[in-house]
């Protein structure tokens, strides 16, 4: 999980940030991104791909990340921004915002996926994209954990005002119960109007 970071540290980059996002495929809520700079040469086995961890393991890993990170930042793009930009551009913008919020700032960023280069994100840092990076890079995995836990908590808070959509369980993702609630109650301001919210 540190091969990418070790190569960059050897090249003289001390503050290597991992970037990842959560919530691209959701019908409701923001897309949330995180940037995390971990200390050089420190490997933490609890930090793994967030999708491979239970909720409890993610929360424990988040606490470890918050204790150990040199810097961490979380950012989001709202449903309105998603509708205005499209989900891909909003996800990339959220990652750019997260990296911009790191203090101290990164001197290199590892970005999950392969869209950063393809979409010419306007960012000041040297970078490398890593497909399935949350399973290959500790820094990206740490960012995936922060983004996922932050977004899940936000959607559970929103559930209190809109329990009919079951966001406490589905956290905005497209489930049959979510589609059924949309048919019965319509969309909220938290839904992404550019997404297909209704289906037969």
Swiss-Prot record:
It catalyses: Endonucleolytic cleavage to 5'-phosphomonoester. One of its GO terms (molecular function) is RNA-DNA hybrid ribonuclease activity. InterPro entries: RNase_HII, RNase_HII/HIII, RNase_HII/HIII_dom, RNaseH-like_sf, RNaseH_sf. It holds the Pfam family RNase_HII. It comes from the Bacteria. Its main location: cytoplasm. One of its GO terms (biological process) is DNA replication, removal of RNA primer. Its EC number is 3.1.26.4. Keywords: Cytoplasm, Endonuclease, Hydrolase, Manganese, Metal-binding, Nuclease. A divalent metal cation binds at residues 20-21, 112. It is found in: Cytoplasm. Manganese or magnesium. Binds 1 divalent metal ion per monomer in the absence of substrate. May bind a second metal ion after substrate binding. The keyword Manganese applies. PROSITE patterns: RNASE_H_2. Endonuclease that specifically degrades the RNA of RNA-DNA hybrids. NCBIfam families: PRK00015.1-3. This is Ribonuclease HII. It comes from Salinibacter ruber (strain DSM 13855 / M31).
């Amino acid at each position: 999980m540190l091969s990418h970071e070790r190569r960059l540290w050897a090249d003289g980059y001390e503050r290597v940030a991992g970037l990842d996002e959560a919530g691209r495929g959701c019908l409701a809520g923001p897309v949330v991104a995180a940037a995390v700079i971990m200390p050089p040469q420190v490997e933490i086995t609890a930090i793994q791909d967030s999708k491979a961890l239970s909720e409890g393991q993610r929360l424990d890993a988040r606490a470890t990340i918050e204790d150990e990170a040199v810097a961490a930042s979380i950012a989001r793009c709202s449903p309105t921004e998603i509708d205005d930009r499209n989900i891909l551009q909003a996800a990339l913008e959220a990652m750019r915002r997260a990296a911009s919020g790191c203090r101290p700032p990164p001197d290199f960023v590892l970005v999950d996926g392969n869209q950063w280069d393809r979409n010419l994100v306007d960012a000041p840092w040297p970078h490398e994209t890593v497909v399935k990076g949350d399973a290959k890079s500790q820094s990206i995995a740490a960012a995936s954990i922060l983004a996922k836990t932050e977004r899940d908590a936000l959607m559970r808070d929103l559930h209190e005002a809109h329990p009919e959509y079951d966001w406490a369980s589905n956290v905005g993702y497209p489930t049959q119960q979510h589609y059924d609630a949309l048919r019965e109650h319509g969309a909220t301001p938290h839904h992404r109007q550019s997404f297909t919210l209704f289906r037969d």
